């Protein structure tokens, strides 16, 4: 629900005062409207899991293949862990995900 200031017509924002009472306050003028009898919910962003967490840290249990790391100039890696997933439609080829054994760099091939 959007509310606007009756004095200057700017949007009112929810703020909490020192007493713990929530108010709708205008940033442009001193207008404040106390909020009573309404529950206020706060949205929080949850951290996303890394690919290692999704696999349960099981990169060591997946197959290895000889392939050159895209960061070969810096790490010299010539083997990588890999697994395949069907992430597109069934008539498309599977996507192969790689992780370099030396530096841990991850990449994929369609």
Curated annotation (Swiss-Prot):
Sequence positions that bind Zn(2+) 2: 69, 75, 100, 103
BP GO annotations: termination of RNA polymerase III transcription; transcription by RNA polymerase III; transcription initiation at RNA polymerase III promoter; tRNA transcription by RNA polymerase III
UniProt keyword Transcription, yes or no: yes
Residues that hold Zn(2+) 1 according to the record: 5, 8, 26, 29
GO cellular component, one term: nucleoplasm
Keyword Repeat: no
Zinc finger motifs (C4-type), residue ranges: 5-29
Location relative to the cell: Nucleus, Nucleolus
S-S bonds: none
Biological role stated in the UniProt entry: DNA-dependent RNA polymerase catalyzes the transcription of DNA into RNA using the four ribonucleoside triphosphates as substrates. Component of RNA polymerase III which synthesizes small RNAs, such as 5S rRNA and tRNAs. Involved in Pol III transcription reinitiation and RNA cleavage during transcription termination.
Protein name: DNA-directed RNA polymerase III subunit RPC10
């Amino acid at each position: 629900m959007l509310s606007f200031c009756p004095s200057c017509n700017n949007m009112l924002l929810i703020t909490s005062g020192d007493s713990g009472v929530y108010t709708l306050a205008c940033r442009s003028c001193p207008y404040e409207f106390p909020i009573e009898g309404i529950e206020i919910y706060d949205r929080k962003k949850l951290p996303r899991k890394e690919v290692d967490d999704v696999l349960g840290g099981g990169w060591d249990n997946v197959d290895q293949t000889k392939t050159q790391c895209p960061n070969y100039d810096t790490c010299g890696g010539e083997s990588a862990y890999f697994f395949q997933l069907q992430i597109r439609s069934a008539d498309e080829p599977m996507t192969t995900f790689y992780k370099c054994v030396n530096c841990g760099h991850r990449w994929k091939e369609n």
